[in-house]
């Protein structure tokens, strides 16, 4: 298979020189900046899709883990050229996740208090980058979700909410483990292949 590995904005070589860790810049400049960053990520991927389409690539799919899963879910909402989408341990409400993380949640709550912003308003401010805000652009039988039963970083409720939003899409696979330790990874990789074979994405 031909695989395109995408480096998201503010990750790896794309991070700022003063960034304390990869991905820091994604969250560190406020809600509007997070929206712009996600829009940038989706734009980058779609530019690559345009290029691959021009080369004559017959079909494309997307998968990603963690923030990559979040991005994969949003891409499935905006680009119907995808043959399949398989978000892995995705989040669906970035605001709720930020509020649960420490110390990010502490800083976010201080900012919200100073700005007199409620949690509802904060959620609405980043709703544009959530897959829950859109109907999927591809058929539900071409969507698959993977989640860790013990994930505390991207809690299972996020995957379940997305599954319901996607009208209980094609497949939902739970694995033993958490966000970092994927026990039985071989099983969900086989499940992914079975799913892709079922929709005729792979022979």
What residue spans do the PLM features occupy?
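Histidine-bearing beta->alpha loop at or near hydrolase active sites
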Residues: 174-188
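Conserved acidic catalytic loop of the alpha/beta-hydrolase fold
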Residues: 32, 42-58
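Gly/Ala-rich beta-loop-alpha elbow adjacent to hydrolase catalytic centers
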Residues: 63-72
């Amino acid at each position: 298979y031909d695989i395109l590995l995408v480096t998201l904005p503010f990750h790896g070589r794309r991070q700022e020189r003063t960034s304390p860790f990869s991905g820091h810049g994604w969250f560190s400049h406020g809600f509007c900046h997070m929206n712009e960053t996600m829009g940038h990520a989706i734009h980058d991927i779609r530019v690559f899709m345009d290029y691959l389409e021009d080369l004559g690539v017959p079909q494309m799919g997307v998968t990603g883990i963690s923030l990559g899963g979040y991005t994969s879910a949003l891409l499935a909402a905006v680009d119907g050229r995808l043959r399949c989408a398989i978000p892995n341990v995705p989040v669906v409400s970035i605001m709720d996740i930020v509020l649960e993380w420490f110390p990010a949640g502490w800083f976010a709550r201080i900012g919200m208090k100073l700005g007199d912003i409620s949690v509802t308003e904060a959620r609405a401010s980043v709703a544009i980058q959530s897959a829950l805000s859109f109907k999927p652009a591809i058929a539900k039988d071409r969507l698959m979700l993977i989640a860790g039963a013990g994930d505390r970083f991207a809690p299972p409720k996020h995957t379940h909410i997305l599954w319901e939003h996607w009208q209980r899409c094609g497949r939902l696979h739970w694995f033993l483990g958490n966000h970092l330790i994927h026990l039985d990874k071989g099983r969900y990789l086989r499940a992914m292949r079975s799913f892709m074979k079922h929709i005729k994405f792979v022979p």
